[in-house]
A protein has these predicted regions:
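C-terminal motif of bacterial Sec signal peptides marking the signal peptidase cleavage site
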Residues: 28-31
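Bacterial signal peptide processing site
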Residues: 33-36
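Extracytoplasmic "Venus flytrap"
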Residues: 48-88, 107, 113, 328
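Beta-alpha junction/loop-to-helix N-cap segments that form part of ligand/metal-binding clefts
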Residues: 84-85, 96-162, 172
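Periplasmic-binding protein-like
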Residues: 123-135, 154-157, 193-198, 246-261, ...
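An alpha-beta-alpha
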Residues: 170-227
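Extracellular/periplasmic periplasmic-binding protein-like sensory domains
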Residues: 261-333, 346-347, 397, 401-404
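Segments of small-molecule ligand-sensing domains
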Residues: 321-395, 404-406
């Protein structure tokens, strides 16, 4: 199913139309060949966007299938940096795909909802059959209004699953996938009782809801969940309650990043909880040097994509553009590789719901992924262990999906 970057012809069919689709696209998308956190989604590059105005008015390629690409090219700060890096990644994907029969209509949405709606409308008026982007949740909602009115699907990059829906698919790293993977792994290792210490934030609300659902679905039980102020204040009382409940649990869930996870661990320690007695787990936000340096979190498990694909992509990006890509750049690369593969192999059904929600999924830079009918996605993630020297692999990312994608 997976081939080297040079192998770009469809693989041997594995049975049925969807089997052929899965096999062929896995090879096509492997032409490139980890987890985004809310705190680092735009990376740390200090290089300003180059030629944003010119890029906003340009097209990439001259193929028959037109594809809208909406990015915050002229947005201030890190958003603009991300937009330019994602445009570069889209260009790189096009260049590396063998005879891509697509034309990318690059539109600058300015990082605003109004800009996104206008950009989507313009791309559709110019013949776009599918929209890639935007990046921000409010922009996705606005672009979706224009796209739905014309029956044009959207593959967006927001991490807010609330904006997904009929015809609006999210390619981003969603916290729900993180929770599903890490809880599932813990239960597979014989853990059954969970206690959660969760930041009181929109992100915390999402992961808490998913945490409770996944634990119940997989046959475990949640002993208690306590919330703490996202700014790290007033942790004493909720930490005390978690420490008491932890006596009846064998897993401690701390879904926070960097300083937040460290502060939570210290507060629990001050409340008398011995984290070494439990298996501590987190989300992809743990992929952070501050987490690795915290003794109370050492040995904790967290999910992340296999880093090999991103390292290889970064090297090629650096060679072409002279700087490191932001982490979101892989989303644009995979989106372009996906639509190029679909345009090449799927004829008139290239962007149909059936094609996009193929349960066998697709292979990209960061591993396998598939879209669900509700517009969210599932990703094949590895499980890593936090150590002072960084994340250490304890379970590899799956290379294929089993079961339906619903």
């Amino acid at each position: 199913m997976f081939r080297t970057p040079q192998a770009r012809l469809p693989a041997r069919p594995c049975g049925g139309r969807r089997g052929i689709l899965a096999a062929g696209l896995a090879v096509l998308l492997s032409a490139c060949s980890g987890t985004l956190s809310s705190s680092d989604m735009f990376g740390t590059s200090s290089v300003a966007p180059a030629g944003a105005e010119q890029a906003a008015q340009s097209a990439i390629g001259t193929g028959q299938t037109k594809v809208g690409l909406l990015l915050p090219l002229s947005a201030p700060g890190n958003a603009g940096l991300a937009g330019q890096a994602m445009r570069n990644a889209a260009e790189l994907a096009f260049a590396e795909f063998n005879n891509a029969n697509i034309q990318l209509l690059v539109k600058d949405d300015g990082g605003t909802a109004q800009g996104a709606q206008q950009a989507a409308q313009q791309a559709i008026d110019e013949g776009a059959e599918i929209i890639l982007g935007p990046l921000f949740a409010q922009s996705v909602t606005a672009a979706a209004q224009a796209a739905r009115a014309r029956g044009v699907p959207v593959i967006a990059f927001s991490t807010d699953s609330n904006v997904a829906g009929r015809g609006i698919f999210l390619l981003s790293f969603l916290p729900e996938s993180d929770v599903d993977r890490i809880v599932g792994y813990a239960i597979a290792q014989g853990r059954r009782s969970f206690v959660g210490f969760v930041p009181d934030s929109p992100y915390g609300s999402v992961v808490e809801a998913e945490f409770k659902q996944v634990v119940a679905r997989k046959g475990g039980r949640v002993v208690a969940v306590e919330r703490y102020a996202a700014d790290g204040s007033k942790m004493t009382e909720p930490a005390r309650l978690v420490a008491e409940a932890a006596a009846r649990a064998d897993v401690l869930f701390i879904p926070d990043s960097g300083d937040g996870a460290v502060a939570a661990a210290k507060a629990l320690g001050a409340a008398g909880l011995d984290a070494k007695r439990l298996q501590v787990i987190g989300t992809g936000q743990w992929d952070d040097p501050r987490v690795f340096a915290e003794p109370a979190l050492e040995g904790g498990w967290y999910p992340a994509p296999d880093s090999g694909g991103f390292r290889a992509f970064s090297a090629r990006y650096r060679t072409r553009y002279g700087q490191d890509p932001v982490r979101t750049a892989t989303l644009a690369y995979d989106a372009v590789a996906l639509v190029a593969a679909l345009a090449k192999t799927q004829g008139d059904k290239r962007f149909s719901p059936e094609t996009l929600t193929n349960p066998s999924g697709f292979a990209g830079i960061d591993g396998v992924f598939r879209f669900r009918a509700d517009g969210t996605n599932q990703r094949g993630l590895a499980v890593l262990k936090a150590t002072p020297s960084g994340g250490q692999m304890v379970a590899p990312a799956p290379r294929s999906f089993g079961g339906s994608g619903t």
